[in-house]
């Protein structure tokens, strides 16, 4: 396996995260061409964990509105520590550089927290440089 590390900064300043883990490169045909890269890791997010319920008793209308807005506009990860499975389809350009289409999922997996298990899915393009 190979070690990976990544940081994701949210431009709306909501749920940023950093992750580390392991991945395995599976060549599709001859080495130096296309490959799959499945991986698993752990992430830490600064996103919300444990949002308060909007239907709690004795709330002011303003507090109920605030909690309702949070419910519909923020992800409640349930935990700051999350699983980070990922999958990439890549092409090795040369010995040091690859380009990948990637999919990453963040979730507590009902292991780090019981109850709500909202997650975050992230798809994109990566430029990979091997040291």
Describe the residue ranges of each PLM region:
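Outer-membrane beta-barrel transmembrane domain signature
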Residues: 10-131
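Transmembrane beta-strand segments of Gram-negative outer membrane beta-barrel proteins
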Residues: 1-7
């Amino acid at each position: 396996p190979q070690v990976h590390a990544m940081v994701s900064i949210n431009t709306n300043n909501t749920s940023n995260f950093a992750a580390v883990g392991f991945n395995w490169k599976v060549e599709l045909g001859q080495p130096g061409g296309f490959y799959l890269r499945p991986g698993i890791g752990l992430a830490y997010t600064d996103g919300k964990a444990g949002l308060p319920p909007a239907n709690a008793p004795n709330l002011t209308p303003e507090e109920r509105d605030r909690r309702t807005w949070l419910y519909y506009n923020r992800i409640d990860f349930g935990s700051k520590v999350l699983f980070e499975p990922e999958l990439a389809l890549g092409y090795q350009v040369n010995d040091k550089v690859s380009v990948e289409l990637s999919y990453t999922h963040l979730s507590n997996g009902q292991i780090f927290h019981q109850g709500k298990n909202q997650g975050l899915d992230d798809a994109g393009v990566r430029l990979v440089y091997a040291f």
